Amino acid sequence: MINILVHGLGQDEKSWNEVKNQLNNNGINVETPNLFSIVKNYQVNYDNMYKTFADYCNSFNEKINLVGLSLGGVLVIDYITEFPEKINSIILIGTPYKIPKTIFTIQNIIYKFMPKRIFENIGCSKKDAISLLDSMKNLSIPDKAPHIKSNTLIICGEKEKDNINMKSAKQLNKVIQNSKFKIIENAGHEVNIDNPIELANTIYDFWEGQWKNYKVTTKLQVSN
């Protein structure tokens, strides 16, 4: 089995470091691709990012456990829609049910005033980040999510309880038949950064536990 953690927009593969370390310490190996690195030979937009991400996943011969945060979750939904036979299970973290076009527009305006070095730190240019966000505005997740049949865990940070991301998580839980829902305490949108220990524990328990009796009970060994 291949385990892949997919970062969100504004992150890179290092955003998973603490989660990855905790899982490694407990005998689970994970892959953490950098989305901007795998799309570097193409114009940066969502279609090209998905194509290169799908090629990356298809390079593995084994079935896959996919974990995606935000943008990563959108890619996971598209991948399982096209290649359901490749998937063992998926975890969606802070993943939108409907693309918030107004929020994306505001975010792009903010991006235009941010220093270039902030984007360079995650391996992309300001221009590429703006282009990517623009290309995602018309994606249609509601057409795809109800057709997901694999075991699915949907996660949202506790601090998002009053915003659109919590509503999205509950809606995904409603329309995906074999899904369960988990709130991670002391975390906002970037759950992998805000509370990596509890997230790693939750991922471990979901992957290693019995699906029908899934609940967060197993405790991971915490590295120093």
Where does each model-flagged region fall?
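Catalytic active-site module of serine/aspartate enzymes centered on a nucleophile-bearing elbow/loop
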Residues: 186-224
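Active-site loop/oxyanion-hole signature of alpha/beta-hydrolase fold enzymes
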Residues: 17-20, 29-65, 201
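Short beta-strand/loop motif that positions the catalytic acidic residue
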Residues: 148, 154-157
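Gly/Ala-rich beta-loop-alpha elbow adjacent to hydrolase catalytic centers
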Residues: 68-76
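Active-site nucleophile elbow and catalytic-triad environment of alpha/beta-hydrolase enzymes
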Residues: 128-144
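Active-site glycine-rich loops that stabilize anionic/oxyanionic intermediates
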Residues: 8-11, 70
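Conserved alpha/beta-hydrolase "acid-adjacent" motif
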Residues: 161-168
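Flexible "cap/lid" loop of the alpha/beta hydrolase fold
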Residues: 81-82, 90-116
